[in-house]
């Protein structure tokens, strides 16, 4: 469980998240090509070539970004330019409804994500290149792990159509 809190005495933009990497096969087990992912989302935030939100949204139907059913990463990774580094807008659901999941058939481990946040930044380690040492000195290569970062809309302060992330 990850639980954050913030307090301020003035209006302050706040968008707390965590950039923890996971590989459900364990440390030093290669890439995440054998993982299945699901996210309860029908839209994502569009970004420019520098991965900065443009303020636009894109429907996911019929695209490799549609992860409403568990999808094997290796079956769609070649359809994406680099993998995922995208903010998925979560569907409104009842409290206690699972917002996302990851599963490895190899290990049998399933990770479930529940959040009160509006979305998830889903990242598949596209820029991991083996230069940074992780646990036990293992060097993680491209797609060596994934992140599911629950948070409010990224860059909301610059887009009037996005829900505000300002703490009052």
PLM regions with names:
Residues 1-168:
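An exposed, glycine/acidic-rich loop-and-rim segment of catalytic or binding clefts
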């Amino acid at each position: 469980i990850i639980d954050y809190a913030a307090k301020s005495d003035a209006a302050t933009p706040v968008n707390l998240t965590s950039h923890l990497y996971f590989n459900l096969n364990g440390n030093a087990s290669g890439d995440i090509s054998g993982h299945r992912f699901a996210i309860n989302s029908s839209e994502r935030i569009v970004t420019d070539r520098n991965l900065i939100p443009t303020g636009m949204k894109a429907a996911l139907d019929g695209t490799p970004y549609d992860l409403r059913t568990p999808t094997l990463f290796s079956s769609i990774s070649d359809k994406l330019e680099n993998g995922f580094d995208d903010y998925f807008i979560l569907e409104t659901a009842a409290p206690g409804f699972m917002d996302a999941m990851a599963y490895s058939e190899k290990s049998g481990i399933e990770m479930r994500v529940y959040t009160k946040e509006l979305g998830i930044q889903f990242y598949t380690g596209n820029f991991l290149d083996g230069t940074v040492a992780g646990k036990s000195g293992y060097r993680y290569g491209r797609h060596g792990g994934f992140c599911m970062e629950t948070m409010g809309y990224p860059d909301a302060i610059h887009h009037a159509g996005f829900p505000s992330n300002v703490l009052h």
